[in-house]
């Protein structure tokens, strides 16, 4: 009499999922977080570049009569925020630098600054202007970190962006 032999390969699907599935899920979430961080970094760089380009073509000749195309810090900031879809204006800090000096503000506060920029004499054709942006980024991956409680947080990374142009008009 022969007995049917059970398969020698037995396993527990719950245990196998725990050992393989959870690290895979964590890897996927980590990949999305890295992509979100790089998206913010690239968007910030693009937005600051667009703001600097916009300011560089609104120089001294825009403020001379009969032209009325001079721009303010508020208008440049709005241009940066329009180009930077998803950038939080309450965290984005901007620094406007020209030959005459530097202006620092959070994007929310910059939106109410009606100072013409770049001001004379820094708005002369050929002068350099620069806009710097800084965006703090904190990953939400700590929510998914195994064994973490409510007190576990990861550090904040500052994403810098800088753009320099010469005044063209």
PLM regions with names:
Residues 5-7, 131, 166:
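Intrinsic disorder/low-complexity segments enriched in polar/small residues
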Residues 2-81:
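Alpha-helical assembly-interface signal, strongest on the long, hydrophobic N-terminal helix that forms
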Residues 52-132:
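Short amphipathic secondary-structure patches
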